[in-house]
Amino acid sequence: IGDIQGKDPVEAALDLLIEEENAVGMIDYYGSEELVIKFMKRPEQNFCTDGLLGGKPHPRVYGAFARGIGRYVRELKALSLEEAIFKMTYKSALTMGIKDRGHLAPGTKADIVIFDKNKIIDKGTYVEPTQYADGIKYVIVNGYAVIRDGDYVGGSSGTIVKL
């Protein structure tokens, strides 16, 4: 931005923050896919996303986990499907100290995603980030379907988990 405006980059960023009253977001791309895979294979790694909703979010807000399965499991074979699912669900829950989520067992919360492993993939781009992933048939949160036959049907069965 600074280069485009002929300003010092820090000055341009501060001017933008003032002009937009701090309502500024940033989408950053860095690193190589080779490095992503190297970290992904580490035993202590969990899958997550730190994207925020609203405005024009990072494409992974709508497709981080579908990308994990479609790109890194199916296409690149960096992980097995079982290992990826474990890192996305139970391992992540255990890391956060949440024992009643991330796996299916009596007394646990019934959060389930039913997908076609041969079709699941993220579709969001930096230009159009708010696209739902392909290949997801059902999403069931606390026993209620919020995606049915691939279509978002709404609902607010999820809850904020206090750590």
Language-model region placement:
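C-terminal cap of metal-dependent C-N hydrolases
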Residues: K38-E44, T49-D50, A64, V113-T159
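His/Asp/Glu-enriched, well-ordered alpha-helical/loop segment
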Residues: I1-E19, G31-K117
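Short Gly/Pro-enriched turn/cap motifs at secondary-structure boundaries
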Residues: I27, R60, P129-Q131
